[in-house]
Every structure is written in structure tokens, then in C-alpha cells.
């Protein structure tokens, strides 16, 4: 496993961790190319922020290496749209994207309180109720709410 981060936040002894340093040419693009020479099983890229990084991540993925990264977006469809906005072609994205895991920050008491109140009791209806409240308050669109709801 090779990680490319800016900065390396948590040191992991069982991974090769590379940190960006653009002042000496250590960009995402350069470090991704460098890491491909090592043929890792998994490549973790800190964040896709620009066209150069998006293209490099897609190239790495198309070599058959499993690549994980983050993209800031407001919804699952927004992730897809954001990658297309960064110059990745529809065909490239269709050939390399295996899935999207999406998380939303929850306002209020915090994640631990929310998880204890809702998930430990396996209460999907509580989650769906909260999604409905967020929709009613204008924090979610109809599309986002439908994507977030837990289906039976």
C-alpha cells in the first residue's frame, strides 16, 4: 500500500507514505508516476483537487491498481460530475470507477451521539426521519434525500 498525502496525517509503519512538496517537484502527478514503478496493490491519494491530479489518478487506476481517493462534493452524483469537470472523459470514468462512498457531516450533537441514538438500536426509521427533517429544512434536495434514505 502506498499513500500520497498533503500532509501525512497518521504515520503507518506498514505503508509507504509519500508527502507532497511542490517546491521540489513532488506533486501528486509526479508521486503517482513514481509509485506506479513499485506496482502497489493499493494506492491511496489524499485528495483530487485539480485537473492534473484527476488525470494522474485515472491513469493509475487504468493500469489495474486499486486506487482510493477523496473528492469534495455535496452529493453522490456531485462526485461524478466533479471528476468530469476536472477533465476526465466519460469513457475513462466508466472504465475505472468501481464505486463511490459518500459521507455527510451531521450537525448537532456529533457523530458519536447520533450513532448511539440511531445505529446501535438498528433504527433505520430514525435515520430516514432525520433525512426528512433535513429535507424540510432545506439542507437537502429531493435527489439527495432519496439517495441518503435507508431502504428496507
Predicted regions and their residues:
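Short, flexible helix-loop junctions that flank or precede catalytic/ligand sites
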Residues: 1-152
